[in-house]
Amino acid sequence: MAVKKRSIFEEVGQGAKAPVPQGGSIDRGHGGARRGIRLWLMALFLLVMAMIVVGGLTRLTDSGLSITEWRPVTGAVPPLNEAQWAAEFDKYRESPQYRLMNAGMTLAEFQRIYWWEWGHRQLGRVIGLVWAVGFLGFLAARRIPRGWWPRLLALGALGGLQGGIGWWMVASGLEGDKVTVESTRLATHLGLAFIILGLIAWQALLLGRSESDLLQARRQKEGRLVTLTTVLIGVAFLQIVLGALVAGIDAGRGFPTWPDMNGTFLPADMFYVPGVETDWRNPAWWLGLLQNPGFVQFLHRMAGYTLAALGLIFWIFGRRSRHRATRGAFDLLAMALLAQILLGVGTVLSAAEWQVAIAHQVGAVVIWVLILHARHLALYPRVGSIRKGTL
């Protein structure tokens, strides 16, 4: 039988084609899931941002203590008739806030503050529902990229924790002769809200680019800018917590002057705590200082100046980046910081008028997200060699 002669080079250029390089494990078969999960996270981001704004308005309208029970499920249904409204009003009239601050309030006036608090809680329920439907839906369809389900589950767990902290905060204003919630609990509640918002934003940024893009981009990360933005995250978070402490005791309304504080740099009685001797070694004195309007307002101003100064200094470093998108991110951050300074001064001079105060709170959200965006681009620069698919 004749045997066909074959060239020793026949397999080269003939037969099976060379395999085309593939993306990472997350990219393979999960492109649609990445887009879907990112859209779901963006919806959650908008809802959490709305939650922060509505929460701020609820506080500014003194509505947060109008609902004196925690009913996560049955509380979703508001009073539907006169008898139910009367029952809710009776519960509120047993609270110290009603007795000491709102005695004589009419049912119509109560309904106005009730709707603010009910809306705030209802928005929390909506967030929980959107998270659960999205997470369980992607999980059941097996469309969650490898390694991502713990991150997405953690968001839901933090959301549940936030609901519990919210009630823990409200409960602090229903005891004794309290007419407001404990400022430290308010700061805990708001701080966790920003942590959740930041985690959602970060995951959405990552999902906006393919895994192969991120792997290539990370090789060109700008370590100094990553470090600087990490510092900014820490200072910004401290400033957010201090802002909550100021809001919790209405400290902003006691010093409506700028750049001084009622004519002085250090406010009078800044270190005074009623009933506690001034002693640097006494923890009770330190905790008491958090209830001193002059002390917390001074710290909030100083932290604001620090954040603005660091942000503008870091902007100079950001402008030296060899990546255009990174430079643009630092430009946006610098402009937002300047705007936030103006809003902060406006909040002080207006004695925390609600319109200016809520704009200042929204400004904090914007700066928080822009710092994360700048850090993302410092860690994963957009470069011309990376194929399309970037955010």
Curated annotation (Swiss-Prot):
GO molecular function annotations of the record: metal ion binding; oxidoreductase activity, acting on NAD(P)H, heme protein as acceptor
Predominant location category: membrane
InterPro entries xrefs: COX15/CtaA_fam (IPR003780), HemA_synt_rhodobact (IPR054616), HemeA_Synthase_type2 (IPR023754)
Binding residues for heme: 300, 360
Cofactor field: heme b
Paired cysteines (S-S): none
GO cellular component: plasma membrane
Pfam families, per the entry: COX15-CtaA
Subunit structure comment from the entry: Interacts with CtaB.
NCBIfam families associated with the record: HemSynCtaAAlphapr (NF045570)
Family note: Belongs to the COX15/CtaA family. Type 2 subfamily.
Name this protein carries in UniProt: Heme A synthase
